[in-house]
């Protein structure tokens, strides 16, 4: 944590700057007055992506279960505790419909791109648990179709009743 006092002020300024930088696939800077392209605007909030990926890989949960947990974790930013130094403007909340929509996009992209993992050369497994490497624990056919996961996701209502 930057506010823990582990680093000097100059280092803290650099770390805050890095954390505050928008992540973008664009290598060309935006023109003056334009916003840089936001990866999160295209693929969804990283906090939801990470939450979904963790529960899918680590626990093998169905999408409907992940959405249920996501909704309980992210429905109200004012509830629960946040890490020390976590800025108020970075405390997000998402309604059920948004969570379901971002999960749908995640499933389509994640499952539809498994073929990219099978092109890696053979090599050693370095880390246990949660690896997406073809030599790791994750095993999914490179020609997998997301239909079963998307069908499960459709069992989730768009709004909470």
What are these regions (language model features)?
Residues 1-161:
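ATP/NTP-dependent adenylation/nucleotidyl-transfer catalytic domains that generate, transfer
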């Amino acid at each position: 944590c930057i506010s823990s006092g582990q680093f000097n002020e100059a280092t803290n300024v650099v770390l805050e700057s890095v954390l505050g930088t928008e992540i973008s696939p664009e290598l060309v800077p935006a023109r003056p007055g334009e916003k840089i392209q936001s990866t999160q605007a295209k693929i969804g909030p990283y906090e939801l992506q990470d939450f979904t990926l963790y529960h899918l890989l680590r626990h093998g949960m169905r999408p409907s279960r992940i959405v249920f947990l996501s909704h309980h974790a992210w429905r109200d930013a004012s509830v629960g505790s946040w890490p020390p130094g976590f800025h108020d403007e970075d405390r997000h909340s998402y309604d059920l419909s948004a969570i379901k929509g971002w999960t749908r996009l995640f499933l389509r992209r994640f499952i539809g791109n498994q073929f990219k993992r099978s092109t890696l050369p053979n090599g050693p497994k370095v880390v246990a648990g949660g690896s997406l490497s073809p030599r790791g624990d994750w095993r999914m056919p490179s020609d997998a179709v997301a239909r079963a996961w998307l069908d499960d996701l459709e069992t989730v209502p768009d709004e909470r009743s």
